Amino acid sequence: MLQPKKTKFRRQQKGRAKGNAQRGNQLAFGSFGIKALETKWITGRQIEAARIAVTRYMQRQGQIWIRIFPDKPITRKPADVRMGKGKGSPEGFVAPVTPGRIIIEAEGVSYEIAKEALRLAAQKLPITTKFVVRRDYDIQNQNA
């Protein structure tokens, strides 16, 4: 499961993710990717499930990049505990995602394989996504 090796503080305030992604909103490494269309927290387990789905479908060909990392700690209080008495203990980590953020990128496979692999990955995530292709990529003249 993805999580930071070390954090400065054990707990963090919830905060609100407003607006669109200001960085990480364009393809940087691969020719294909999936882009988030809504705001949500994505857990490390969900990212790992998406990564496994892509890797299995691509049969370990090509290369993938995970562009988000769960570095925000989430706390939970135990069941049957009354309000108050402090913040709960850390339970896991999430990656806050805003619209426009590239989540996964792929390279080194054909257009059809990449589209299906990233569709399978998108099904593992709790948000709606969109398949994106690099602007200068020529679908008719694939060299992959």
Curated annotation (Swiss-Prot):
It comes from the Bacteria. Binds 23S rRNA and is also seen to make contacts with the A and possibly P site tRNAs. InterPro entries: Ribosomal_uL16, Ribosomal_uL16_bact-type, Ribosomal_uL16_CS, Ribosomal_uL16_dom, Ribosomal_uL16_sf. Residues 1-17 have a biased composition (Basic residues). This is Large ribosomal subunit protein uL16. GO terms for biological process: translation. It comes from Bacteroides fragilis (strain ATCC 25285 / DSM 2151 / CCUG 4856 / JCM 11019 / LMG 10263 / NCTC 9343 / Onslow / VPI 2553 / EN-2). Keywords: Ribonucleoprotein, Ribosomal protein, RNA-binding, rRNA-binding, tRNA-binding. The lineage of its organism: Bacteria, Pseudomonadati, Bacteroidota, Bacteroidia, Bacteroidales. GO terms for cellular component: cytosolic large ribosomal subunit. Coiled coil: none annotated. PROSITE patterns: RIBOSOMAL_L16_2. Part of the 50S ribosomal subunit. The gene is rplP. Residues 1-22 are annotated as: Disordered.
